[in-house]
Amino acid sequence: MVEAFCATWKLADSHNFDEYMKALGVGFAMRQVGNVTKPTVIISSEGDKVVIRTQSTFKNTEISFKLGEEFDETTPDDRNCKSVVTLDGDKLVHVQKWDGKETNFVREIKDGRMVMTLTFGDVVAVRHYEKA
């Protein structure tokens, strides 16, 4: 089912992302960059691993993981997390844990777009991606 996500995705629109970054403790300057950056996300399946590459004018990141197995992740805002990604029906669920905190991203395909819902506490942001 992860194959449905395997594509190159370009950010089309974003809602409440600044509030989400603020809740995470991201500083003002980095939030300003985060708000104007339109990343390209490339999701691929390589053997038993899933690879998510995020490319932008600000920073490029790459994570490689097996579904359901914890891995170490350094986020674009330099948090060191223990992360796990699972498939829950038709949703790709990504949980990051650090310093006693937890955030999650749920990616799903709706009408040919990838919808990413980011949740930290009671703050929710939604980002829509279109195939590039």
Swiss-Prot record:
Keyword Cytoplasm annotated: yes
Residue(s) carrying N-acetylvaline: 2
Single GO term (MF): transcription factor binding
Subcellular location: Cytoplasm
UniProt keyword annotations, A-Z: Acetylation, Cytoplasm, Lipid-binding, Transport
Any one cellular-component term (Gene Ontology): cytosol
Claim: Membrane is one of the keywords in the record: no
Binding site for a fatty acid: 127-129
Parts forming coiled coils: none
Source taxon at top rank: Eukaryota
Pfam families: Lipocalin (PF00061)
GO annotation terms (biological process): brain development; fatty acid transport; neural retina development
Comment field on protein domains: Forms a beta-barrel structure that accommodates hydrophobic ligands in its interior.
The family this protein is said to belong to: Belongs to the calycin superfamily. Fatty-acid binding protein (FABP) family.
Function: FABPs are thought to play a role in the intracellular transport of long-chain fatty acids and their acyl-CoA esters.
Name of this chain's protein: Fatty acid-binding protein, brain
